[in-house]
C-alpha cells in the first residue's frame, strides 16, 4: 500500500523528532556518567531502546509495504544497536573499565543509526516527490514503477485495473472555472481514496483520469467494485464555494494477467472506458480476455 502525502509528512516529522530525542538521550547519558548514576532505565536497561519515544513509535509504525520494510527493519536494528553500545559504554565508564573499543563501538552505532534514518527519509521523499501536487495521490510515475511488483504479489487474488474518467469535465471548467474544477478533482480524489480498501491504491493518471488498482478473487467481484465506485460518485455531490456540483464517471475495468506490461492493461481498460463514453457515460464497462466489452 502506497502511503498518502499526509502519512509521509507525519513519518518525516517523527524521524526529525527522533534526532532531537536522541540528542537529549546523549545529554542524559553524559549527566549519568558524571554523576556515576547507573540507575536510569532509559539508558541502562537491557531493552532501553524500547523505552525511548522513537522505540515506542517504530513499534507501532505500519502497515508497511514490501519496498519499505527493509528500511524500517534496518532503522530498528541500528536503533537497538546504538542503545546497546551506549549502555555498555556508560557502564564501562561508571565501573572504571572502559576501553577505546567502547567509544569506537558507540560512535559506529550512532553513525549507523543516523545513516539508516537518512536512507529511510530519502526513500520517503522520493515517493513524496512523485505524488500529484493537486490531489495528493500517487501519480503516473509511481504506478509505472510499482505495477510489476504489485502484479507479481497479487496472489491469491487477481489484479485488476480500473480506469475512470470524469464525464464532461470540460463543461465543469467552462461553466465554473478552473479553480472549481480543481476542487472537483481534489474532492473526487479524497472520495476515491476513502472508498477503496487499504491494500488498493488510487492514482491520478492525468487530467481528469484516475486509476484504481483492485484486487479481487474473480471478474465478477472486480466488476462489482467498479459499479460500486461509479454509483458512489453519482450519489455524492461535490461542495464548493458557490454551491454543489454533481458529477459522474465512466470506468473501464480490465484484469492484469501475469507478466503483462502496464501499458497493455491500460490500453484494454481505456478501450472499455471509451466504449462506455460512446454508449451513454456514467457506467462501468468490463473488457475480458477476448477483448469483448460489456456493461456491468
Swiss-Prot record:
Gene3D superfamilies recorded: 3.30.70.270, Aspartate receptor, ligand-binding domain (1.20.120.30)
Keyword GTP-binding: yes
Positions of the catalytic residues: 208
Site (described: Transition state stabilizer): 170
Binding residues for Zn(2+): 22, 52, 79, 83
Intrachain S-S bonds: none
Reactions mediated catalytically: 2 GTP = 3',3'-c-di-GMP + 2 diphosphate
Residues annotated as binding Mg(2+): 165-166, 208
UniProt: substrate binding residues: 173, 178, 182, 195-200, 215, 224, 228
Requisite cofactors: Mg(2+)
Record domain GGDEF: where: 157-289
pH dependence: Optimum pH is 7.5.
Consequence of substituting residue 83 to L: Displays constitutively high biofilm and PgaD levels
PROSITE patterns associated with the record: GGDEF
EC identifiers of the protein: 2.7.7.65
Cofactor notes: Binds 1 Mg(2+) ion per monomer.
GO cellular component, one term: cell pole
SMART domains documented for this protein: GGDEF
Entry's Gene Ontology molecular function annotations: diguanylate cyclase activity; GTP binding; identical protein binding; protein homodimerization activity; zinc ion binding
Entry superkingdom: Bacteria
Task of the protein: Catalyzes the synthesis of cyclic-di-GMP (c-di-GMP) via the condensation of 2 GTP molecules. May act as a zinc sensor that controls, via c-di-GMP, post-translational events. Overexpression leads to a strong repression of swimming; swimming returnes to normal when residues 206-207 are both mutated to Ala. Overexpression also leads to a reduction in flagellar abundance and a 20-fold increase in c-di-GMP levels in vivo. Required for aminoglycoside-mediated induction of biofilm formation, it also plays a lesser role in biofilm production in response to other classes of translation inhibitors.
NCBIfam families in UniProt: GGDEF, PRK09894.1
Protein name from the UniProt record: Diguanylate cyclase DgcZ
Organism, as annotated: Escherichia coli (strain K12)
Amino acid at each position: 500500500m502506497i502511503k498518502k502525502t499526509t502519512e509521509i509528512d507525519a513519518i518525516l516529522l517523527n524521524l526529525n523528532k527522533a534526532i532531537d530525542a536522541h540528542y537529549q538521550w546523549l545529554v542524559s547519558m553524559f549527566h549519568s556518567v558524571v554523576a556515576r548514576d547507573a540507575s536510569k532505565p532509559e539508558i541502562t536497561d537491557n531493552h532501553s531502546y524500547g523505552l525511548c519515544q522513537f522505540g515506542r513509535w517504530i513499534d507501532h509504525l505500519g502497515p508497511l509495504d514490501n519496498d519499505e520494510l527493509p528500511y524500517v527493519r534496518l532503522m530498528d536494528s541500528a536503533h537497538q544497536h546504538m542503545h546497546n553500545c551506549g549502555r555498555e559504554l556508560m557502564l564501562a565508564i561508571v565501573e572504571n573499565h572502559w576501553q577505546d573499543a567502547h567509544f569506537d563501538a558507540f560512535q559506529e552505532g550512532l553513525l549507523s543509526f543516523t545513516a539508516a534514518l537518512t536512507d529511510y527519509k530519502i526513500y520517503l521523499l522520493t515517493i513524496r516527490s512523485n505524488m500529484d501536487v493537486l490531489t495528493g495521490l500517487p501519480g503516473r510515475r509511481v504506478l509505472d514503477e510499482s505495477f510489476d511488483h504489485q502484479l507479481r504479489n497479487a496472489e491469491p487474488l487477481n489484479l485488476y485495473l480500473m480506469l475512470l474518467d470524469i464525464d464532461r469535465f470540460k463543461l465543469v471548467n467552462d461553466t465554473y472555472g478552473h479553480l472549481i474544477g480543481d476542487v472537483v478533482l481534489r474532492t473526487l480524489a479524497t472520495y476515491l481514496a476513502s472508498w477503496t480498501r487499504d491494500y488498493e491504491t488510487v492514482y491520478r493518471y492525468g487530467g481528469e483520469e484516475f486509476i484504481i488498482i483492485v484486487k479481487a478473487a474473480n471478474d465478477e467481484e472486480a466488476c462489482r467494485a467498479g459499479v460500486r465506485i461509479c454509483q458512489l460518485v453519482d450519489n455524492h455531490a461535490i461542495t464548493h464555494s458557490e454551491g454543489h456540483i454533481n458529477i459522474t464517471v465512466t470506468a473501464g475495468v480490465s484484469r492484469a494477467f501475469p507478466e503483462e506490461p502496464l501499458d497493455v492493461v491500460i490500453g484494454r481498460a481505456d478501450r472499455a472506458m471509451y466504449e462506455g463514453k460512446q454508449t451513454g457515460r456514467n457506467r462501468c464497462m468490463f473488457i475480458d480476455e477476448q477483448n469483448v466489452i460489456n456493461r456491468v
